Swiss-Prot record:
Keyword Transmembrane helix applies: yes
PROSITE patterns named in the record: ATPASE_A
Signal peptide (UniProt feature, chain positions): none
SUPFAM superfamilies: F1F0 ATP synthase subunit A
Protein's UniProt keywords contain Zinc: no
Organism of origin: Pseudomonas putida (strain ATCC 47054 / DSM 6125 / CFBP 8728 / NCIMB 11950 / KT2440)
Pfam families: ATP-synt_A (PF00119)
Name of the protein this chain belongs to: ATP synthase subunit a
A single GO molecular function term of this UniProt record: proton-transporting ATP synthase activity, rotational mechanism
Gene: atpB
Amino acid sequence: MAAETASGYIQHHLQNLTYGQLPDGSWGFAHSAAEAKAMGFWAFHLDTLGWSVALGLIFLLIFRMAAKKATSGQPGGLQNFVEVMVDFVNGSVKDSFHGRSPVIAPLALTIFVWVFLMNAVDLIPVDWIPQLAILISGDPHIPFRAVSTTDPNATLAMAFCVFALIIFYSIKVKGLGGFIGELTLHPFGSKNIFVQILLIPVNFLLEFVTLIAKPISLALRLFGNMYAGELVFILIAVMFGSGLLWLSGLGVVLQWAWAVFHILIITLQAFIFMMLTIVYLSMAHEDNH
């Protein structure tokens, strides 16, 4: 345990491995939340970036292996698994997406599997990866968070990528004029041109808030659920370090019970992120909403 107190232990496990410019002007790693905050916008969460890229590569490698080994005869276990995943996502897209785009199904599959893998890291005991980072670095105080989706920077980045696609397809399908009209002529309208002009600011305010709420809610929903789940695992780990036999025994029971329940959470959150992406992009392909 890198920190001596329970509060210090919790804070240590909730801090990212942050690299940026220190107050003295040099570049290095932050060893406290205050140092990380002082680094400002151009601070890099290397643990989030590293795990996100690594899990993305694992996803690509697994599916590439399945594609190369695919046969029309008796499929293997990996091919069966990939086919089930593809059929599941393809069915979800057909049920929820009402436009035509060859990008949506691959995007939905990528989002579901990638988010699921990032969430699944939360099932690894909370001390294992941070302790490995300490052994490799030789620094007993270095923080390291392995669950990328407990970092709001990661979830917001994914959500705003989806938001960029929403804007792109809205303009592509409806035209720039149609997109602007969608923001300014709805939900209130009038046959009187003068009244309609007066309603434009009201419509724009309502539609803009609705539009910008999509990526924010998408990101914060995933972050909030995964952060809460990670915090519960950390609190259970504190029980093991309490020194009380009965509390440690309770921690064992809670650890397994929460891990089993958390399997549902990590799968459900990946599914929700994927489905909302499909729905938002379907709305972008529709002429009216």
